[in-house]
């Protein structure tokens, strides 16, 4: 046995408007609550309110309902009882294709609960916004295909229906693409509740006007909570561990990068006199980490307190935009030493003093720490006086400095003294540069009378009659062949000017065919006596 619906009912769009209105009332029972049905004789029923979702800022509104194809109904079984109260029982098969429903609502984005009233003023930064903000969201269910077996009970007061063997498929689109996968998964898990509670109540309320012509709305007692304790909103989990797997890793990486780039836990940007994007402000997502790093005794002894004190569960809030002044949370914000630490004697006086000093330094912004200055090139008067006593300055009339002999014992190692050239002698006549006019760039304009006479240190020591040990270099200094070579190489003079021998000129026959070499004197790491560089010897 089967029948068809009247096509005219679906063409004039009156049926769609009725379905849209009934779905809106079913999804928002608190907005369309009948005051007569909730008021009792003793007034106890007036406190019974339906459960309200904390995440929703406003109610759910059904904006559009469209049945593009006419639904089909097939009667599988029918039982009519002839009693004073007429009763009709039947089993039907309902099939619906290509339907569309669009709903809108607003969710509240207030993920942090701030205890600003109980936090110290000097450690609590200025918040840009402490209020919640609403985000509109639109959800569209398109291409809905439904096949279900229903049990129908028809009385003279209304129509009751129950769904069995439901097969549902639809395409879901959300205005917030980040939450689309998570919402779609939750909706598919909650479809059982929709077909067991929501749709039967909607159909029953619609049938009241058809059968009794009474008031359009009769609340189902099952939708009203019987316990007043249900009025308190329990905390909800927005995202489970299974939901995190459905989120896009690329999107989560972008969000984490954006959040980490905006975090700032330093106290310098919080001060009003420093340069910052928003002076004296901190972002709300950083407040919890900022408060946990504030130097206080409770933060330092938090682990010790947690061993003796049971975990405290903060009370939940009815609305997400309300702020609760929690007294239990204030115990952990105040700078006081816990009683558990005093009883166990596990405190440290130095740590307590350091924490108090850090709090004072952070609170006192006018305390400017002076930087340490280091001056180079100057010595104090005491150091200069001691240096003058140890090494007296010679008289201005003396041109040659006199080396003071040391009074160290004989066992000490004597310093190495470099051989110095004797008084410069005039070069032989054979080396006069009369035939070399092109070597004028290599000559010097220093006059002879301005050059001081060079005196050996050993000769000066002999005048003072101070015995001193000679090293190998000083012993070889007094040999005759080295004297002649040194006189010719150190200060050759031509026409009262210093002259540097060129490679083209004639070489003096001083060595007489003998080989003479120096090993290791040209190395920069070695030093020739007290001079930085060795004398200008040339390689053969």
Curated annotation (Swiss-Prot):
Any Gene Ontology CC annotation: ERMES complex
Chief location of this protein within or outside the cell: mitochondrion
InterPro entries membership: Mdm34 (IPR027536), SMP_LBD (IPR031468)
GO biological process: mitochondrial genome maintenance; mitochondrion-endoplasmic reticulum membrane tethering; phospholipid transport
Location of this chain's protein in the cell: Mitochondrion outer membrane
Bias kind Polar residues: ranges: 35-44
Segments of this protein annotated with the region Disordered: 26-51, 379-399
GO molecular function: lipid binding
Superkingdom, taxonomy of origin: Eukaryota
Topology of this chain in the membrane: Multi-pass membrane protein
Assembly mode: Component of the ER-mitochondria encounter structure (ERMES) or MDM complex, composed of MMM1, MDM10, MDM12 and MDM34.
Domain comment as written in the entry: Lacks alpha-helical transmembrane segments, suggesting that it resides in the membrane via beta-sheet conformations similar to those predicted for other outer membrane proteins and porin. The SMP-LTD domain is a barrel-like domain that can bind various types of glycerophospholipids in its interior and mediate their transfer between two adjacent bilayers.
Function in brief: Component of the ERMES/MDM complex, which serves as a molecular tether to connect the endoplasmic reticulum (ER) and mitochondria. Components of this complex are involved in the control of mitochondrial shape and protein biogenesis, and function in nonvesicular lipid trafficking between the ER and mitochondria. MDM34 is required for the interaction of the ER-resident membrane protein MMM1 and the outer mitochondrial membrane-resident beta-barrel protein MDM10.
Record-given protein name: Mitochondrial distribution and morphology protein 34
